[in-house]
Amino acid sequence: MTKNYSFEGEGGNATLQDLFGNKQTLVIYSYMFGPQREKPCPMCTSFMGTWEAKLPDVEQRIAFVFVARSPIARLIEAKKARGWTRHKVYSDPSGDYTRDYVSAADADAPGYNVFTRRDGTIRHFWSGETGRATADPGQDPRGAPDLDPLWAVLDTTPEGRGKDWYPSLSY
């Protein structure tokens, strides 16, 4: 890793190294909530909601954070609106991390990246792919593997995901 990316979190500034905490593996889910968006992406928000109950289990073994391009105050506001207490949210204000690991064009796109830290060296281990090439006709792109139980369940039904249905941002 040649750059030490800088993020803004609820507790202040943090580097990529800081995001690991005391773990050797870090997962960063980049969600679609760029500065041009009024609200976060409903699909990303739904996916993130599935982690609220599981983060304590996951974080026994790895560090898991959520990154978006909007200012940290907006990320915190959206987190509170959903009632999330366990999500560690960070802003990528410069866009450096997003351009290097999610979208070279700095597009408002989701991303799932795994990093390792061994002997003080950070390496990129794995990325999930959810680009347009993974979309079925009339559908949004799907990740492989699809980590969201909402889609895993709907994909087993005759109705499927639906062409125009999105999860709600409030219930």
Task: Describe each model-derived feature in a short phrase.
Residues E77:
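Short active-site loop/helix that positions an aromatic residue
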Residues G9, L55-R74, T85-D96:
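Thiol-based oxidoreductase modules, predominantly thioredoxin-like and allied folds used
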